[in-house]
A protein has these predicted regions:
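Bacterial Sec-dependent N-terminal signal peptides
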Residues: 1-15
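Carbohydrate-active catalytic/glycan-binding domains of CAZyme proteins
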Residues: 11-333
Length: 333
């Protein structure tokens, strides 16, 4: 009540800054989606890589999309840093090829991106997609990306997330090799360059009887509070899974379905990533505040306003072995 009467500054720590809502707006097409947040130890800055959708392109809003980059030195102020170039091609808001859902990790002196790539950008959704591995030096994570190899070459593979797990790396991604085998799949590597595809992920992740989710995309994996977590996007809020071994997954339920009260946070959260900072977990996600969701479809929006998207940040909380999120909580830095 005091905050309402006297304004947020009355409750703000004297040395703190309020993390804005939204944290980032793409100044060109206003369509940032699928955010992937990471820390760059070389440049000492946080970076968000995102699918740069193009709401003003009518039928081509979701294809011809480059990977955009926002950076921050203080975790509060996020600025546009450019569009990624791959093998020297790109760096512009319009792309000949389609890039979706960049999964980015830092290992040693290099960064690695596992991105959904479509060579055919024919509207509305383009041609076949693969998950392709690119690498870049830490001091050039915008224009320094060079192709390594294709990790998954089935034609509907999308949305890779990669996590280091002891002496190896685990990857999860959305795939549908045949008409009746759609779901979240698992792969594993000991060097990031050679991958073994292990088929459908185990446990509750693909168990429709348990989750009631017939479709999920945009999975993100991370470790926190002694567990491995996967947060996926079934277009009905965010689905949370927990595991002790990153192999057998238990379903927790849905978070962040109910609208928030912060500016442009008034609808369900979509396709997130998480970063751990000072033992706290912060979730970054995109929202489409003007989209009227149809519960029976996975539509992305028809007109310009429905397709506009913004990036938001909230803090995750851990209680009694489960994840929670109060997306209305004001964040201070």
């Amino acid at each position: 009540l005091v905050c309402v009467m006297w304004g947020l500054h009355a409750c703000q720590p004297a040395t703190g800054l309020i993390v804005p809502s939204p944290i980032y707006v793409d100044n060109h097409y206003h369509g940032p989606a699928d955010p992937e947040i990471t820390w760059n130890p070389k440049t000492k800055e946080w970076m968000i890589f995102y699918t740069s959708r193009r709401p003003f392109k009518d039928q081509a809003s979701y294809v011809g999309t480059p990977v955009g980059v926002a950076v921050s030195k203080d975790f509060v102020h996020w600025n546009f840093a450019g569009y990624c170039s791959f093998d020297g091609v790109g760096g512009k808001p319009d792309s000949e090829k389609t890039y979706w859902a960049p999964g980015v990790i830092v290992e040693g002196d290099s960064a690695h991106m596992f991105v959904t790539l479509k060579d055919d950008s024919t509207p509305v959704w383009g041609g076949p997609s693969n998950i392709v591995h690119f690498s870049a030096p830490l001091d050039d994570m915008i224009s320094g990306w060079r192709r390594v190899n294709t990790v998954v070459d089935t034609p509907i593979s999308i949305d890779a997330t990669v996590i280091k797990n002891g002496d190896h790396w685990d990857m999860w991604y959305r795939d549908r090799p045949t008409e009746d085998t759609g779901g979240l799949y698992h792969a594993q590597s000991h060097d990031l360059y050679h991958w073994t595809l292990n088929g459908l992920a185990k446990g509750d992740i693909n168990n429709v009887e348990v989750t009631k989710h017939t479709y999920q995309e945009g999975a993100y994996a991370f470790q926190w509070k002694g567990y491995f977590w996967i947060i996926a996007d079934p277009h009905k809020g965010l689905a949370v899974y927990r595991s002790k071994d990153a192999e057998h997954w238990d379903y927790q339920g849905i978070i962040m379905y109910e609208p928030g009260t912060r500016f442009f946070d008034n609808t369900r959260a979509r396709h997130p990533s998480v970063i751990i900072r000072d033992e706290k977990a912060f979730i970054v996600y995109h929202v489409q505040p003007f989209l009227e969701y149809n519960p029976d479809t996975h539509e992305a929006g028809n007109d310009i306003y429905q397709k506009l998207s913004f990036l938001q940040m909230a803090e995750l909380e851990f209680k009694d072995g489960k994840l929670f999120c109060d997306r209305n909580k004001v964040l201070y830095e």
